[in-house]
């Protein structure tokens, strides 16, 4: 900018020197001065007169330079400032506005499907809030509307195995409705709810079979009752077998993503960039490792449930749970242990097996006994726990209490839990 300004000043100055108007004005002043002194302006004159004329000429140019240079420099600087203030912000703002419009694809996805995402609360009817007098929230999760007449899809672990509770659903517009559990498949961890309201926004279902690793996805839900919370990431794997996750009785290849799936958005939709649900958010192992149930498996569950409803019965499958402890858990397979140890320094290096407590239901026996999310169960009643099946076997035992050995970070602890009958 400084070079361009000085160049302009030089050009303007040269033009002024060569200007016939300025030459004419300077000549007229010189002729007038010589005429007053009685000197012929057209004569050559003597050397003294010539020297005097030269001095007059030199003084005239000095006046011109003293007047013109500061004026020209100020004009050039002012023009540069005006150009910078008037043009630069306009161009920058125009470019940024275009980027927001062209590249904010995540916001476009959310705007198209957020209205179909709901918040699910499990209320404990035995315990009441001191101030409001309402049942306390024992658990929460998310779901999404799949039919306009109030059918909602979620995870089974969000709504079942919670005795003495009631289910409430809050829509994106703030309205709250009681809900009934219609269909449950504990094997695939899927369930449907029904609320008595019509003309709802419906989530479109896509195809998980066409997904590729590296595709962008968006996880929607309501963690901690914060409606329409959004996390984004990519598909890390489309074929993560349930055996790798230590999930028993499940023949499912899960979707793995680095989009954060938490307690609150569990049961919510995992959406592609077309705004279609391609999975149901299921669980998070650690930062950057979360899993979702592919929507193709969900469609099979929904078809079977619809057939059952036509016959006047509900679709309910899964293994029976004789007693209730109140946790969601995940078997620590060698692959998961490797990932956990590589991401956290609080994992004991000699740990080779166990069950990770992923979620603890408020007010449950596990919560009352002191279990916390992130604890690792290694023994129950002195029996080694290698997978989630061992925990279910311990619950099926007739022991009144469960003496559980856990790892909380690198510290080993004992907790005692008294399971409840469902």
Swiss-Prot record:
Propeptide segment residues? 18-74
Q: How does it sit in the membrane?
A: Single-pass membrane protein
- Which range is the signal sequence, renumbered to this chain? none
Which positions form the organelle transit peptide? Answer: 1-17
Q: Which GO terms describe its molecular function?
A: serine-type endopeptidase activity
Q: Annotated region Disordered: where?
A: 28-55
Which residues belong to any copy of the PDZ domain?
325-410
- State where it is primarily located: mitochondrion
Residue ranges of the TM segments: 64-82
Q: Which SMART domains match?
A: PDZ
Q: Which UniProt keywords apply?
A: Apoptosis, Hydrolase, Membrane, Mitochondrion, Protease, Serine protease, Transit peptide, Transmembrane, Transmembrane helix, Zymogen
Catalytic reaction list: Cleavage of non-polar aliphatic amino-acids at the P1 position, with a preference for Val, Ile and Met. At the P2 and P3 positions, Arg is selected most strongly with a secondary preference for other hydrophilic residues
State one Pfam family annotation.
Answer: PDZ_6
Tell me the GO BP annotations in alphabetical order. Answer: apoptotic process; ectopic germ cell programmed cell death; mitochondrion organization; positive regulation of apoptotic process; proteolysis; spermatogenesis
Entry GO terms, CC: cytosol; mitochondrial intermembrane space; mitochondrial membrane; Nebenkern
Q: Where is this motif: IAP-binding?
A: 75-78, 94-97
What family is reported? Belongs to the peptidase S1C family.
Q: Summarize the subunit comment.
A: Interacts with th/DIAP1 (via BIR 2 domain).
Briefly state the protein's biological role. Serine protease that shows proteolytic activity against a non-specific substrate beta-casein. Promotes or induces cell death either by direct binding to and inhibition of BIRC proteins (also called inhibitor of apoptosis proteins, IAPs), leading to an increase in caspase activity, or by a BIRC inhibition-independent, caspase-independent and serine protease activity-dependent mechanism. Can antagonize antiapoptotic activity of th/Diap1 by directly inducing the degradation of th/Diap1.
Protein's UniProt name:
Serine protease HTRA2, mitochondrial
The gene designation is HtrA2
